[in-house]
Regions:
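Conserved beta-strand-loop-alpha-helix junction that forms the acyl-donor binding cleft
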Residues: 108, 133-145, 163-167
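Short acidic/polar active-site loop segments enriched in Thr and Asp
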Residues: 130, 155
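Basic/polar N-terminal segments that are highly enriched at the extreme N-terminus
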Residues: 1-7
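Conserved residues at the C-terminal ends of beta-strands
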Residues: 88, 135, 160
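Acetyl-CoA-dependent GNAT
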Residues: 8, 12-99, 104, 117-118, ...
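Structural preference for beta-strand elements that scaffold enzyme active sites
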Residues: 95, 131-133
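Conserved active-site tyrosine of GNAT-family acetyltransferases
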Residues: 149, 154
């Protein structure tokens, strides 16, 4: 674990940061996906991640960084990328959304995630939004994220998502 100095700054993402941002996110989520895999039906996990979670996440996140770089902010600690956040604005709902947030494992539990969340919320406020949303999964691997969001004042909206394997004959 790296010690967080007083030199935390959050800056706009630049294309030169792309590979670092992708690598950081994969490191951040490496402990999460094995726990998620155990918690969801195999046919669902395999449909979402047929080539492994790293391949899918890398592709999805690369698309975010390439298609909407203006929505991404990066946390630097002493010049080292410690995390990043993508904030989407949904004016039709007067809502900002933390679409992606990732903190390098070396910088977790040092306030980086909280700082990125606050920065994202300020982006939404500056855009005139009146509420903020973040989504995560209910599996054990995402428990730390849920705790952080709840500690930050986010209230859970009970949502249920169901999947059915259509390759199996009906009962």
């Amino acid at each position: 674990m790296k010690s967080m100095s007083n030199h935390l700054c959050i800056i706009r993402y630049e294309e030169s940061m792309r590979q670092n941002a992708l690598d950081l996110a994969l490191r951040a989520w490496a402990p999460v996906f094995p726990q998620m895999k155990e918690a969801v039906p195999g046919f669902v996990y395999n449909a979402f991640y047929p080539d492994g979670w790293q391949t899918r996440q890398n592709s999805d996140l690369a698309q975010v960084l390439d298609d909407e770089p203006e929505t991404v902010d990066v946390a630097l600690v002493d010049g080292v990328m410690a995390g990043w956040v993508c904030t989407r604005i949904h004016p039709e709902d007067s809502m900002g959304e933390v679409y992606v947030i990732a903190v390098d494992p070396d910088f977790q539990r040092q306030g980086i995630g909280r700082a990125l969340m606050e920065h994202s919320q300020n982006r939404a406020l500056d855009a005139g939004m009146t509420m903020m949303m973040v989504e995560t999964s209910d599996d054990p691997g995402h428990a730390p994220a849920r705790a952080a969001y709840e500690a930050g004042g986010y209230q859970r909206w009970p949502v249920a998502r169901y999947f059915k394997d259509l390759r199996r004959p009906p009962i």
